[in-house]
Swiss-Prot record:
EC annotation from Swiss-Prot or TrEMBL: 1.17.1.8
Gene behind the chain: dapB
Family per similarity comment: Belongs to the DapB family.
Classification of source organism: Bacteria, Pseudomonadati, Pseudomonadota, Gammaproteobacteria, Vibrionales
Principal location: cytoplasm
Official protein name in the record: 4-hydroxy-tetrahydrodipicolinate reductase
Binding, (S)-2,3,4,5-tetrahydrodipicolinate: 156, 165-166
Amino acid sequence: MVRVAIAGAAGRMGRNLIKAVNGSQFAVLAAASERPESSLIGVDVGEMAGLGKSGILIVDDLAKVTDDFDVIIDFTLPISTLKNIELCQEHNKAIVIGTTGFSEPGKEIIDQASKEIPVVMAPNYSVGVNLVFKLLEKAAKVMGDYCDIEIVEAHHRYKVDAPSGTAIGMGEAIAGAMGNKLEDVAVYAREGITGERSKDEIGFATIRAGDIVGEHTAMFADIGERVEITHKATDRMTFANGAVRASHWLHKKEPGFYTMHDVLNLDQI
Protein backbone atom coordinates (compact mmCIF):
# COMPACT_ATOMS: atom_id res chain seq x y z
CA MET A 1 0.00 0.00 0.00
CA VAL A 2 1.51 3.30 -1.10
CA ARG A 3 1.02 6.40 1.07
CA VAL A 4 0.09 9.31 -1.20
CA ALA A 5 0.35 13.07 -0.71
CA ILE A 6 -1.76 15.31 -2.94
CA ALA A 7 -0.36 18.72 -3.87
CA GLY A 8 -2.97 21.33 -4.76
CA ALA A 9 -5.66 19.35 -2.98
CA ALA A 10 -8.44 21.92 -3.38
CA GLY A 11 -8.15 22.29 -7.16
CA ARG A 12 -10.32 20.46 -9.68
CA MET A 13 -7.74 17.74 -10.22
CA GLY A 14 -6.75 17.72 -6.55
CA ARG A 15 -10.28 16.86 -5.45
CA ASN A 16 -10.52 14.13 -8.06
CA LEU A 17 -7.16 12.72 -6.97
CA ILE A 18 -8.40 12.58 -3.39
CA LYS A 19 -11.46 10.64 -4.52
CA ALA A 20 -9.32 8.33 -6.66
CA VAL A 21 -6.97 7.53 -3.78
CA ASN A 22 -9.95 7.02 -1.48
CA GLY A 23 -11.37 4.45 -3.91
CA SER A 24 -8.09 2.64 -4.55
CA GLN A 25 -7.18 -0.71 -3.03
CA PHE A 26 -3.48 0.03 -3.62
CA ALA A 27 -3.11 3.54 -2.13
CA VAL A 28 -4.01 5.46 1.00
CA LEU A 29 -4.30 9.22 1.39
CA ALA A 30 -1.58 10.34 3.78
CA ALA A 31 -1.13 14.09 3.25
CA ALA A 32 -2.51 17.06 1.31
CA SER A 33 -1.33 20.59 0.67
CA GLU A 34 -2.60 23.90 -0.63
CA ARG A 35 -1.00 27.28 -1.28
CA PRO A 36 -0.14 29.15 1.95
CA GLU A 37 -2.79 31.84 1.46
CA SER A 38 -5.62 29.30 1.06
CA SER A 39 -8.49 29.50 3.54
CA LEU A 40 -8.51 25.69 3.60
CA ILE A 41 -5.23 25.30 5.51
CA GLY A 42 -6.00 23.19 8.58
CA VAL A 43 -9.26 21.83 7.13
CA ASP A 44 -9.84 18.06 7.04
CA VAL A 45 -9.13 17.02 3.44
CA GLY A 46 -11.82 14.33 3.44
CA GLU A 47 -14.49 16.78 4.50
CA MET A 48 -13.24 19.30 1.93
CA ALA A 49 -13.65 16.68 -0.82
CA GLY A 50 -17.08 15.61 0.41
CA LEU A 51 -15.90 12.19 1.61
CA GLY A 52 -16.31 12.67 5.34
CA LYS A 53 -13.73 13.07 8.08
CA SER A 54 -10.32 11.61 7.18
CA GLY A 55 -8.08 12.86 9.97
CA ILE A 56 -5.74 14.37 7.35
CA LEU A 57 -5.44 18.14 7.66
CA ILE A 58 -4.44 20.29 4.69
CA VAL A 59 -1.01 21.86 5.19
CA ASP A 60 0.66 24.77 3.44
CA ASP A 61 3.90 22.85 2.85
CA LEU A 62 4.40 19.10 2.47
CA ALA A 63 7.83 19.55 4.09
CA LYS A 64 5.96 19.57 7.40
CA VAL A 65 4.69 16.00 6.94
CA THR A 66 7.44 14.18 5.03
CA ASP A 67 7.34 11.20 7.42
CA ASP A 68 3.72 10.55 6.49
CA PHE A 69 3.93 9.82 2.74
CA ASP A 70 5.87 7.86 0.12
CA VAL A 71 4.82 9.54 -3.14
CA ILE A 72 3.60 13.03 -4.08
CA ILE A 73 1.06 13.39 -6.88
CA ASP A 74 1.38 16.92 -8.25
CA PHE A 75 -0.99 18.51 -10.78
CA THR A 76 -0.32 22.16 -9.92
CA LEU A 77 1.85 24.80 -11.60
CA PRO A 78 5.49 24.49 -12.70
CA ILE A 79 6.85 26.72 -9.92
CA SER A 80 5.06 24.67 -7.24
CA THR A 81 5.99 21.34 -8.78
CA LEU A 82 9.68 22.25 -8.94
CA LYS A 83 9.60 23.06 -5.22
CA ASN A 84 8.05 19.67 -4.50
CA ILE A 85 10.69 17.96 -6.64
CA GLU A 86 13.36 19.59 -4.49
CA LEU A 87 11.51 18.38 -1.39
CA CYS A 88 11.42 14.83 -2.76
CA GLN A 89 15.15 14.92 -3.44
CA GLU A 90 15.87 16.09 0.10
CA HIS A 91 13.73 13.36 1.69
CA ASN A 92 14.09 10.50 -0.83
CA LYS A 93 10.45 10.52 -1.95
CA ALA A 94 8.95 9.64 -5.33
CA ILE A 95 6.81 12.00 -7.39
CA VAL A 96 4.12 11.64 -10.04
CA ILE A 97 3.98 14.81 -12.15
CA GLY A 98 0.86 15.81 -14.06
CA THR A 99 1.76 19.50 -14.27
CA THR A 100 2.29 20.85 -17.80
CA GLY A 101 3.81 24.02 -19.24
CA PHE A 102 7.39 23.60 -17.98
CA SER A 103 10.15 25.72 -19.50
CA GLU A 104 13.24 24.00 -20.90
CA PRO A 105 15.23 24.81 -17.71
CA GLY A 106 12.36 23.35 -15.67
CA LYS A 107 12.44 20.15 -17.70
CA GLU A 108 16.19 19.93 -17.14
CA ILE A 109 15.68 20.21 -13.37
CA ILE A 110 13.22 17.31 -13.51
CA ASP A 111 15.59 15.25 -15.63
CA GLN A 112 18.45 15.80 -13.18
CA ALA A 113 16.20 15.00 -10.20
CA SER A 114 15.27 11.66 -11.77
CA LYS A 115 18.88 10.55 -11.31
CA GLU A 116 18.28 10.68 -7.55
CA ILE A 117 14.59 9.82 -7.12
CA PRO A 118 11.91 7.92 -9.06
CA VAL A 119 9.81 10.24 -11.24
CA VAL A 120 6.79 9.52 -13.41
CA MET A 121 5.92 12.39 -15.73
CA ALA A 122 3.27 12.29 -18.41
CA PRO A 123 1.24 14.88 -20.32
CA ASN A 124 -1.85 12.75 -19.68
CA TYR A 125 -2.55 9.91 -17.24
CA SER A 126 -5.55 8.47 -19.05
CA VAL A 127 -4.96 4.86 -20.08
CA GLY A 128 -6.80 5.59 -23.33
CA VAL A 129 -4.66 8.59 -24.22
CA ASN A 130 -1.47 6.66 -23.64
CA LEU A 131 -2.75 3.91 -25.90
CA VAL A 132 -3.42 6.64 -28.49
CA PHE A 133 0.23 7.75 -28.23
CA LYS A 134 1.25 4.22 -29.18
CA LEU A 135 -1.25 4.09 -32.06
CA LEU A 136 0.06 7.42 -33.35
CA GLU A 137 3.60 6.07 -33.48
CA LYS A 138 2.41 3.17 -35.60
CA ALA A 139 0.26 5.39 -37.86
CA ALA A 140 3.13 7.83 -38.37
CA LYS A 141 5.47 5.06 -39.48
CA VAL A 142 2.94 3.82 -42.04
CA MET A 143 1.39 7.09 -43.27
CA GLY A 144 3.47 9.99 -42.00
CA ASP A 145 5.66 10.56 -45.04
CA TYR A 146 2.66 10.68 -47.37
CA CYS A 147 0.17 12.76 -45.34
CA ASP A 148 -0.45 16.19 -43.93
CA ILE A 149 -0.55 15.87 -40.14
CA GLU A 150 -2.65 18.16 -37.96
CA ILE A 151 -3.53 17.98 -34.26
CA VAL A 152 -6.68 19.63 -32.87
CA GLU A 153 -7.33 19.87 -29.13
CA ALA A 154 -10.19 21.31 -27.07
CA HIS A 155 -10.43 22.09 -23.36
CA HIS A 156 -12.52 24.09 -20.89
CA ARG A 157 -12.28 27.86 -20.71
CA TYR A 158 -10.18 27.77 -17.53
CA LYS A 159 -7.14 25.95 -18.94
CA VAL A 160 -4.19 28.33 -18.84
CA ASP A 161 -1.68 26.74 -21.25
CA ALA A 162 -1.92 26.01 -24.97
CA PRO A 163 -1.51 23.77 -26.76
CA SER A 164 -2.20 21.17 -24.12
CA GLY A 165 0.51 18.89 -22.83
CA THR A 166 -1.38 15.99 -24.34
CA ALA A 167 -1.42 17.62 -27.78
CA ILE A 168 2.31 18.23 -27.55
CA GLY A 169 2.76 14.62 -26.44
CA MET A 170 0.86 13.49 -29.53
CA GLY A 171 3.09 15.65 -31.70
CA GLU A 172 6.21 14.26 -30.05
CA ALA A 173 5.03 10.69 -30.60
CA ILE A 174 4.39 11.36 -34.30
CA ALA A 175 7.56 13.35 -34.90
CA GLY A 176 9.72 10.85 -33.06
CA ALA A 177 8.32 7.94 -35.05
CA MET A 178 9.29 9.82 -38.22
CA GLY A 179 12.81 10.55 -37.02
CA ASN A 180 12.18 14.23 -36.30
CA LYS A 181 12.16 16.54 -33.29
CA LEU A 182 8.81 18.23 -32.69
CA GLU A 183 10.38 21.67 -32.28
CA ASP A 184 11.73 21.42 -35.82
CA VAL A 185 8.38 20.64 -37.48
CA ALA A 186 5.66 22.08 -35.23
CA VAL A 187 3.48 24.99 -36.41
CA TYR A 188 1.46 26.38 -33.49
CA ALA A 189 -0.35 29.25 -35.22
CA ARG A 190 -1.52 30.27 -38.67
CA GLU A 191 -2.94 33.66 -39.56
CA GLY A 192 -3.25 35.77 -42.68
CA ILE A 193 -1.57 34.74 -45.91
CA THR A 194 0.57 31.85 -44.73
CA GLY A 195 1.58 30.41 -48.07
CA GLU A 196 1.29 26.78 -49.03
CA ARG A 197 1.62 24.22 -46.30
CA SER A 198 5.04 22.56 -46.14
CA LYS A 199 5.01 18.79 -46.31
CA ASP A 200 6.91 18.02 -43.14
CA GLU A 201 5.10 20.30 -40.69
CA ILE A 202 2.79 19.17 -37.88
CA GLY A 203 0.08 21.77 -37.32
CA PHE A 204 -1.70 22.49 -34.04
CA ALA A 205 -5.10 24.07 -33.45
CA THR A 206 -6.49 24.95 -30.02
CA ILE A 207 -10.06 25.41 -28.76
CA ARG A 208 -10.93 26.81 -25.31
CA ALA A 209 -14.64 26.74 -24.55
CA GLY A 210 -17.20 25.89 -21.89
CA ASP A 211 -16.56 22.87 -19.72
CA ILE A 212 -14.84 20.55 -22.22
CA VAL A 213 -12.81 18.07 -20.15
CA GLY A 214 -10.41 17.23 -22.96
CA GLU A 215 -10.65 16.22 -26.62
CA HIS A 216 -7.73 15.47 -28.94
CA THR A 217 -7.62 14.45 -32.59
CA ALA A 218 -4.60 13.68 -34.75
CA MET A 219 -5.36 13.84 -38.47
CA PHE A 220 -3.38 12.09 -41.20
CA ALA A 221 -4.76 13.62 -44.40
CA ASP A 222 -3.82 12.34 -47.85
CA ILE A 223 -5.47 12.99 -51.21
CA GLY A 224 -8.66 10.95 -51.27
CA GLU A 225 -8.59 9.67 -47.71
CA ARG A 226 -8.05 10.82 -44.15
CA VAL A 227 -7.36 8.88 -40.96
CA GLU A 228 -8.25 10.48 -37.63
CA ILE A 229 -7.30 9.12 -34.22
CA THR A 230 -9.39 10.73 -31.48
CA HIS A 231 -9.63 10.57 -27.71
CA LYS A 232 -12.43 12.24 -25.76
CA ALA A 233 -12.45 12.47 -21.98
CA THR A 234 -15.78 13.05 -20.25
CA ASP A 235 -14.66 12.84 -16.61
CA ARG A 236 -11.45 14.01 -14.92
CA MET A 237 -11.53 10.87 -12.78
CA THR A 238 -9.98 9.14 -15.80
CA PHE A 239 -6.81 11.17 -15.29
CA ALA A 240 -6.91 10.87 -11.50
CA ASN A 241 -7.27 7.08 -11.54
CA GLY A 242 -4.35 6.80 -13.94
CA ALA A 243 -2.15 8.98 -11.72
CA VAL A 244 -2.97 6.88 -8.66
CA ARG A 245 -2.14 3.76 -10.65
CA ALA A 246 1.19 5.38 -11.53
CA SER A 247 1.90 6.19 -7.87
CA HIS A 248 1.41 2.55 -6.88
CA TRP A 249 3.65 1.39 -9.75
CA LEU A 250 6.34 3.97 -8.87
CA HIS A 251 6.52 3.10 -5.16
CA LYS A 252 9.89 1.47 -4.34
CA LYS A 253 11.14 1.80 -7.92
CA GLU A 254 14.77 2.70 -8.53
CA PRO A 255 15.56 6.36 -9.36
CA GLY A 256 14.78 7.16 -12.96
CA PHE A 257 12.57 9.09 -15.35
CA TYR A 258 9.48 7.06 -16.20
CA THR A 259 6.38 7.69 -18.31
CA MET A 260 2.96 6.08 -18.59
CA HIS A 261 4.44 3.90 -21.34
CA ASP A 262 6.48 2.30 -18.55
CA VAL A 263 3.56 2.14 -16.11
CA LEU A 264 1.33 0.44 -18.71
CA ASN A 265 4.15 -1.56 -20.34
CA LEU A 266 3.10 -0.19 -23.74
CA ASP A 267 6.49 -0.77 -25.32
CA GLN A 268 5.63 -4.48 -25.37
CA ILE A 269 2.72 -3.85 -27.76
